[in-house]
Amino acid sequence: MPLRVIPAARLLTLIPAFLAAGAVEAAAATARPNIIFLFSDDQTARAIGLENPEVITPNLDRLAREGVRFTHHYNNTAICMASRCSVLTGLFEHRHGCNFEHGDLQRRFLEQSYPVLLRRAGYYTGFAGKVGFDLKGEKFETLAGFFDQWAGGPGQTFYETEKNPGIAKYAARYPHSSRAYAAWAADFLTAAKASGKPFCLSISFKAPHLPFTPDPQDAKLYAGKTFTRPPNYGVEKGRHLSAHARTSRAATGYREWINAYDESAAAYYALITGVDAALGMIREALAREGLAENTVILYSSDNGYNMGAHGFGDKVLPYEEASKSPLIIHDPRLPAASRGRISTALTGQVDIAATVHAFAGVPAPGGIDGRSLLPLLDDPAGRVREAMPLFNYWGVSSAQSLAIVTPSWKYIFWAHGGDGLRPTEELFDLAKDPHEMVNVASDPRHAAALNEMRRRYDAELAAIAATRVEGHGYEKYPVLFSRTIPWTEKPAPEKGSTAKGKRKAGREEN
């Protein structure tokens, strides 16, 4: 879809003023929207007020009512490092190669990321918050040079503002980092306006990632409350699932969601309320600077979170709670009739970059996996794809998987055949069973659907073989994930990568 621009008649009336001010750049800046991308950490799709009234998110709710909310938004890899690189580049994990146990991001991929390309095209750019990855062979500080303003932090960053150098000066007023990032953003907006350029700002909050330590002013809103468990809550609601999933850290750790659900939910939701408050602060700053009417806001999260569904904590797994997160796109230039709509189209984290490029009118790199979502703003009932792959290339071999999701079905193949496990298929009728309570893979009534999803799976596996990046350990997956090659003919997993092996990443690593 073409980029929306100022009507020609109005633009003609502004030309004299532009010429007097020295013109062409100002006209281009006015025609191109400003773009803000806000990114939470570990926020599952139902953890906003419009999905769950127990979560206090008035600003997110308002953003959705004034924009378009996407209810089938998937994280192509449901873990932070890979997801963040997919957001920046528009590439699936096996194409950019960055994840735990697979390696750091190569510079050539960062140089084709949306912030770098928009800056090259004349945008004033800024980044604050958790980066979540390193550049291969380079110091972390190198990343700052790709932006006009920088307040990014290595590792997990901290909830305590004073411990994050890029925002430490805001600690006295905003001791918790979520609101401090909004204060930094307000100063960025002032500088961006003074630059005379359109801007692209990306903020990556730590919240609501573990450890659950919310701002006290948000925590008190949830103190002592009892929260509704999801329909698929608890270990008993996961007995029907593959034994492979039970070998992942989502099953073996994170027991707070089983042992102390209300306390965990209170802290988790309070952290999200803090991010919501930051969104409100940023929108107030946009209004003060006179930038609100030409600034697009996108909001999402790097992955979902299980919250005790099927007895799981954490993320990583391909089930709905871990693999889906919110996506809201707010374009103030949308006509009133197009606001407040809900799109059920399949979207993914790889689509963020393509969408930002389309808003900015800056061509996206050729061959990326993402697709622009701008057509869905005008037609939320439309589609940009028919199926979406979900990858887990990380962690114990027994819990790694490839899944395919369509608007109605999800197919998961658990390939591991060692450690007492057998390769297993799961098929869920998402239209009738959104909580994934019945695996219908062996039900002959669904044989046609199973065969179609197998076909899509095999095609995706062939694409992995054809497009994977070299040197990051993905060459084994076309064989390991094959449905047709017997387990006994596949290469043995590396030492320490099985369910009985040593886990390489702990609770706080990602």
Task: Show where each model-derived region lies.
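Active-site segment of extracytoplasmic enzymes that catalyze sulfate/phosphate-ester chemistry
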Residues: F37-F39, T44-F127, K136-G137, Q149-K163
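Loop/turn elements at helix/coil->beta-strand transitions in domains of secreted/extracellular proteins
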Residues: A31-I35, E66-T71, R120-G126, G145-D148, ...
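Bacterial N-terminal signal peptides
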Residues: A9-G22
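Active-site-proximal cap/lid insertion segments
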Residues: T30-P33, D42-V55, G155-R179, F188-G348, ...
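Bacterial Sec-dependent signal peptides at the C-terminal "C-region" and cleavage site
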Residues: A20-A31
